[in-house]
């Protein structure tokens, strides 16, 4: 593998750049200065930039937070997140109102986009896992530790509830 010290060493070798978010562009709170600078250099050289991420967020949510991290929203052609892919799958798979499913949604209530993830999905969202036909796990409940999920997961296992994560 070739190590580079600056994006300028390879900028003329490619037209398109796929960039991961977490740990490459930012740490969740601050954008890395070298990443901001590199993206600005790529933009000034008319390169096509794409973000790819295993984030549970939808693509729009990821794009909307870029300015807070020091990046320009319009620097990127597209953003693909695992959260967006799951949302698209659920949207397509559960269109039928006749067989509307009960969904137990796990999300961090303190995040800006927890409830927004539900928009456009055709489910009855329920408060108890016992009532669910499926579980949508986006981000952990902020006040729970991993061990606190055991009772919930036992119910899901015993009822053979499908979980999307």
Model-derived features with residue positions:
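HAD-like aspartate-dependent phosphatase fold
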Residues: 1-165
